[in-house]
Design a protein with these regions (language model features):
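N-terminal catalytic or cofactor-binding beta/alpha core of small enzyme domains
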Residues: 1-123, 132-145, 151-173
Length: 173
């Protein structure tokens, strides 16, 4: 029997005006399973927390979840080298020597439930994507990476089912 793939699944705690984050509820409601490492990161621009998770867990693939103000679930196709904290008027680069855009590498299919997005915004979701994809690229790691944005008011049960389906597909690939 094949050993289960090590999948790093992460989301974020509360941030800004949101006292709750749907990604926390989804991650907590998923059953424990072999090979699945679930992490809820604080919503901060702290590069080390993302790199350390990659180094410590040594995943075969990574799936990030983020809360959005959008109306539909979106699969993010790239991370952009920019970040902006609440009080900053202009975005800043995440990496002064990094590429402008980094493509996600985990082909995610969520059926008719999701759209495809080319911008994960300027906040922590995009920051985490960029930092992890940049680390994977710089160290030539064979770790497929994907990211899904889920609306903050989306049906939690349905969102959890969709994430479970994605995780099952990841185990099979």
């Amino acid at each position: 029997m094949n050993k289960p793939k090590r999948i790093l699944l992460y989301g974020f705690g509360p941030y800004r005006q949101f006292r709750d984050n749907i990604t926390v509820r989804i991650i907590k409601s998923l059953p424990r399973q072999a090979g699945l490492k679930k992490i809820v990161f604080p919503a901060r621009f702290h590069r080390a927390q993302f790199v350390e998770a990659l180094k410590r867990f040594k995943p075969d693939m990574v799936l990030g979840l983020g809360q959005s103000a959008r109306r539909r679930i979106d699969v993010e196709s790239q991370a952009i080298n920019r970040r902006r904290a609440r009080r900053e008027s202009k975005p800043k680069p995440i990496s002064l020597r990094g590429r402008q855009r980094l493509k996600t590498t985990l082909p995610l299919k969520i059926g008719n439930h999701a759209g495809k997005s080319t911008s994960a915004g300027d906040y922590v979701c995009n920051f985490s994507m960029y930092v992890m994809l940049d680390h994977i690229r710089r160290y030539d790691l064979d770790i497929p990476y994907g990211f899904v944005h889920i609306p903050h008011d989306y049906d939690e049960t349905e969102a959890t089912r969709l994430v479970e389906t994605v995780l099952l597909r990841c185990q099979r690939t």
